[in-house]
C-alpha cells in the first residue's frame, strides 16, 4: 500500500467494455419538460413562482431538481431565486448533523414574515428533517403548510391543492418503496453533467447515522428504468452521468428476464452496480461515469472489474471509511476492519494504479482515544487519501450511538480534526502540484464563475480547472495542459498536438 496517490495522466489504457445488453428506447409516452426560464410553446402561462432552498448532500440536490420538475410541469410554476416574490417556498433539509437541522428552523423563522405580506404564500419542508420530525415541525412552526419526505415529493401537487382546499397543514412522510420515480416527469438536462438516482435508503444501520430512519431501507430502481432515464439525458447533450444513492454500490436493480433458450440464456435476476456501469458505457455519447456515495462492505469484485474494463468510469473513488481504528469501526457498526478496507483499496489499485481515493472521517466518536485517532492518521498515511470530508461527531437522537458515554473534551476533538484536515490537505495539495505539466481530460461545464471570459470543467479526480477557451467547447471533453495548482482549483490551457 503506497502512502501517496499516483497522478492521473492523459491516455491511460483500459480494456474495451464488452457489449452486454440492448439499450432501452426512451418511453414514447413521456413528454419532455421544458427548462424553466426557456420559452416553450407547450408550457401554459405561469401560475406563480417557486423558490427551493437545498441543504445537504447530492441526493438532496437531485431531489430538489425533481421537485422543480414536478411543480414547473404540472403546476406551471416558474422558478425564482428570490423567496420574497415566491408563491411557494420549499426547503429541502438535511439531518446528518444537529447544526444542519437547527439551520432549518432559523430559515423558517426568517420566512415567517412572508406569510403576513397579504399573499397566500405556501411554505413547505421536505427532506430528512421532515422525515425525522414529521408533525412536530408544524407544532414548532405552525406557519408551515407542507411537510413531506424524500419518498413523497412526487405528491407535492396533491398536497398543495389539499392545503388550499382544506386550509390546514399537510404532512406525508411515508416510505412508499420506489413509487416516486413512477410519477416524475421526464428528466431534463441542465448542463453536460447530470445526476441520476438509482436507489433510495440504506440498510446498514451504522450506529451514528439517521439515514435508515429518514430515507428508509435500501430500494433499487429497476435496471431498465435507470437506462431509460439516461437515454433521455443523452439525447439532451449530457456527457457525464453521476449515479446517486445513500449506499449506491448496494444497487440491485431488477432486470426484465425476457425470452431465454440454449443460445440466449436468461440474464441474472438483478443488475449490480458493476453491470449497470457496463450498460451505461454502451451509450456512445456518455464519456464519463461517476457514482456516490459508497459503503466499503458493498465494494465488490464486480465493481473492481468495472474499473478494470470500463474506461468511461472516472479515475476517482469516494469511499467513506470514517475511522482507522477497528475498535471505533466496531462501535460504529461499520462491518469491516481497517485491514479489510486497505485490502479493497489494494485490489482497486491493482487495476487502476493512478486512481484518486477520497473519503469521509468522523472525529470524536464517543470513546475515541488518542490511540484510536492515531490509527486513523496511520490509515490516512497508508492510503494517501485525496480531498476528503471530515467532521466532529454529532449526536443524533434515536441512533444507538446517542446512548454512548462521551468524556472527550470538545477542545481535544477540535484539535484532532484540525490535525487530520491539515494532513489530508497536504496530501491533496501535493497531488495537485504533481498534476502541473500533465494533460488532463476535462468536461467543459460552462463559463468560470470568477472570470466569465474563461471556461471551467473538472478533471477525473474532481478538481476544477479554469482555462481560456471558446464557448463552443462547452459540453465537450477536451485535453487541458495543467499549468498551475491553486488551493482549490487548477489552471491550464487547451492542449494542442
UniProtKB/Swiss-Prot annotation:
Disordered: annotated span: 1-50
Residue ranges of domain TRAM in the record: 433-496
Gene3D superfamilies: Methylthiotransferase, N-terminal domain, tm_1862 like domain
Enzyme Commission number(s): 2.8.4.3
Keywords noted in UniProt: 4Fe-4S, Cytoplasm, Iron, Iron-sulfur, Metal-binding, S-adenosyl-L-methionine, Transferase, tRNA processing
Protein name: tRNA-2-methylthio-N(6)-dimethylallyladenosine synthase
Reactions catalysed, as given in the entry: N(6)-dimethylallyladenosine(37) in tRNA + (sulfur carrier)-SH + AH2 + 2 S-adenosyl-L-methionine = 2-methylsulfanyl-N(6)-dimethylallyladenosine(37) in tRNA + (sulfur carrier)-H + 5'-deoxyadenosine + L-methionine + A + S-adenosyl-L-homocysteine + 2 H(+)
Pfam families referenced in this protein's UniProt entry, alphabetically: Radical_SAM, TRAM, UPF0004
Sequence positions that bind [4Fe-4S] cluster 1: 57, 94, 128
Binding site for [4Fe-4S] cluster 2: 202, 206, 209
Function: Catalyzes the methylthiolation of N6-(dimethylallyl)adenosine (i(6)A), leading to the formation of 2-methylthio-N6-(dimethylallyl)adenosine (ms(2)i(6)A) at position 37 in tRNAs that read codons beginning with uridine.
Cofactor list: [4Fe-4S] cluster
InterPro entries, sorted: Elp3/MiaA/NifB-like_rSAM (IPR006638), Methylthiotransferase (IPR005839), Methylthiotransferase_CS (IPR020612), Methylthiotransferase_N (IPR013848), Methylthiotransferase_N_sf (IPR038135), MiaB_methiolase (IPR006463), rSAM (IPR007197), rSAM_horseshoe (IPR023404)
Family stated for the protein in its record: Belongs to the methylthiotransferase family. MiaB subfamily.
Segments forming domain Radical SAM core: 188-430
PANTHER family named among the record's database cross-references: CDK5 REGULATORY SUBUNIT-ASSOCIATED PROTEIN 1, MITOCHONDRIAL TRNA METHYLTHIOTRANSFERASE CDK5RAP1
MTTase N-terminal domain residues: 48-165
Subunit structure: Monomer.
Enzyme class: transferase
UniProt-listed PROSITE patterns: MTTASE_N (PS51449), MTTASE_RADICAL (PS01278), RADICAL_SAM (PS51918), TRAM (PS50926)
Lineage per the UniProt record: Bacteria, Pseudomonadati, Pseudomonadota, Gammaproteobacteria, Lysobacterales
Gene Ontology MF, one: N6-isopentenyladenosine methylthiotransferase activity
Cofactor: record remark: Binds 2 [4Fe-4S] clusters. One cluster is coordinated with 3 cysteines and an exchangeable S-adenosyl-L-methionine.
GO cellular component terms listed in the entry, alphabetical order: cytosol
Keyword Cytoplasm listed: yes
Locations listed in the record: Cytoplasm
